[in-house]
Design a protein with these regions (language model features):
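Active-site metal-binding motif and surrounding structural segment of the metallo-beta-lactamase
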Residues: 84, 91-142, 169, 231-236
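Cap/insert and terminal regions of metallo-dependent hydrolase folds
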Residues: 2-27, 221-304
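Core dinuclear metal-dependent hydrolase active-site scaffold
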Residues: 5-7, 19-102, 171-227, 299-317
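Extracytoplasmic/secreted envelope proteins and their assembly/folding machinery
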Residues: 75, 94, 104, 123, ...
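Acidic/polar short surface loop at catalytic or gating sites that assists cofactor/ion binding
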Residues: 31-38, 137-175
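Active-site neighborhood of phospho(di)ester-bond hydrolases with catalytic His/Asp-centered motifs
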Residues: 86-90, 107-119, 142-144, 216-220, ...
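Short, surface-exposed connector motifs at secondary-structure boundaries
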Residues: 106-107, 133-137, 213, 262-269
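Solvent-exposed loop/turn segments at secondary-structure junctions
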Residues: 91-93, 115-118, 147-148, 197, ...
């Protein structure tokens, strides 16, 4: 069992020791010592799992955010080449990553799919967690044209100038059908792209290519229709059930699945469902459209694309 898998097993053991020790003898020195050892083992395994996230053997992504929030909480942490990128800093982004001992100082940039409040709800907290209060720290924020306005407001509220401290906005401004590289180093290429529909709505998608493996992230955009999603190992796409899509005009899970299949996508992960029933319905409708490799994203889920083979591994972190 690898370090990531071991952390779940140790957490179960820790829970059993905690409750068992509390009931039958946590007030004794022996009980307290057992609980302390369990906590130490859990922390050690969590640290090892976090370290493994940043090795060079795979392209990885962690679904982050606040699972208890009733509001939209878009957040995905993509890890490759020893760096981390957060796509959409939704509610609970910083705390969900720090709880899992993921080192926020590895954060290279935040990428916004939409310049709206749900995408930046936790951006200030992400900045604070990633800079550890350094006086001269800057955090690049990429996104649509309106990103500059949002970043300026957050910098003003935090007392930052945006030049030597705070958030620094960058607008890649891709044209429909043409990608723009926003980061390239050590075998990792991060590209921004948009579609005709998403350009009208002010939305941007991102593709991460790392030594033959690829992840495409689009928030609520229609990235599954974009040429940039062709042959991607996995596409993370916001969608709605057929019933909701008919009323709102949103992208349905069935539409997303049909497009993913046409573009030879390896797997599609649906994001943004408000509840478990909606998530299950979306997956069922997507599979009914003829594309079986579909899953619903959940906070704490790890996606791992090993460089040594073509596997797509999905499991809890």
């Amino acid at each position: 069992m690898n370090a990531i898998g071991k952390s779940s097993a140790i957490f179960v053991t820790l829970s059993g020791l905690f409750w068992g020790g509390w009931i039958v003898g946590s007030q004794t020195p022996e009980g307290q010592e057992a609980i302390a050892r369990a906590y130490a083992a859990y922390e050690e395994q969590q640290s090892a799992a976090s370290a493994n996230l940043f090795d060079s053997t795979a392209l990885r992504a962690v679904v982050c955010g606040d699972p208890a929030s009733t509001e939209q909480k878009p957040c995905l942490a993509v890890v490759a080449a020893g760096r981390m990128f957060i796509v959409d800093a939704g509610s609970g982004a910083a705390s969900s990553l720090t709880r899992r001992n993921i080192p926020m100082e590895r954060l290279a940039a935040v990428l916004l799919t939409d310049a709206d409040l749900p995408q930046v709800a936790d951006l200030s907290a992400v900045y604070g967690a990633s800079t550890h209060g350094r006086a001269d720290a800057l955090l690049p924020v990429y996104g649509p044209a309106e990103t500059q306005r949002l970043v300026d407001g957050l910098n003003q509220a935090g007392g930052f100038d945006g030049a030597s401290r705070g958030l620094q906005a960058w607008g890649p401004s891709p044209e429909p059908g043409r990608s723009v590289i926003v980061f390239e180093a050590d075998g990792l290429v991060v590209s921004a792209f948009t579609t005709q529909e998403d350009a009208f709505e002010g939305r941007v998608g991102y593709r991460f290519d790392y030594r033959g493996r690829s992840i495409v992230v689009g928030g609520d955009g229609r990235v599954a229709t974009a040429s940039a999603a062709r042959d991607a190992d996995i596409v993370l796409q916001g969608a709605e059930t057929q019933r909701v899509a008919q009323v709102t005009g949103a992208f349905s899970a069935a539409e997303a699945a049909a497009n993913a299949q046409a573009l030879n996508t390896g797997m599609m992960m649906l994001t943004g469902a408000d509840n478990q029933i909606a998530a299950q319905t979306q997956v069922a409708e997507a599979r009914a459209a003829g594309f079986d490799e579909v899953a619903a994203a959940r906070v704490g889920m790890l996606v791992e694309l090993p460089l040594a083979n073509s596997e797509i591994n999905v499991r809890p972190l």
